[in-house]
């Protein structure tokens, strides 16, 4: 099902431009927007308050290096990531991701579509 709402289409295009090279994240945002379209059509207040803009844009993205020495004495440097989306309901949740196959788009996808809804319903 294609998105028809002009506001959602515009926001999706802006999200694509701000997150190039992150196809998994863009796919997840597209799916979320598709499912939220009926709600957005009925709730102008969500648009006025910029709720969806805040959903797709993290408050902070931290990328850092992690130097380490393997068992053979060889030095390696990996990247670590921490993405923090919204502190409105309390302290950030979620950990730091260090696996070599991970990149920023995957972290944003996981945190935005999996952890955030869980964190909204779980007691702190």
PLM regions: where:
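N-terminal ligand-binding/catalytic initiation module
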Residues: 1-124
């Amino acid at each position: 099902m294609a998105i028809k709402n002009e506001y959602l289409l515009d926001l999706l295009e802006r999200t694509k431009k701000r997150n190039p090279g992150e196809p998994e994240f863009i796919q997840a945002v597209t799916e979320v927007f598709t499912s939220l379209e009926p709600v957005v059509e009925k709730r102008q207040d969500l648009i006025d308050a910029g709720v969806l803009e805040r959903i797709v844009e993290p408050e902070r993205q931290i990328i850092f290096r992690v130097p380490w020495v393997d068992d053979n004495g060889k030095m390696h440097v990996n990247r670590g990531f921490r993405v923090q989306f919204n502190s409105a309901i309390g302290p950030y949740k979620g950990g730091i991701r260090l696996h070599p196959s991970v990149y920023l788009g995957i972290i944003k996808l996981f945190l935005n579509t999996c952890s955030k809804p869980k964190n909204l319903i779980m007691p702190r």
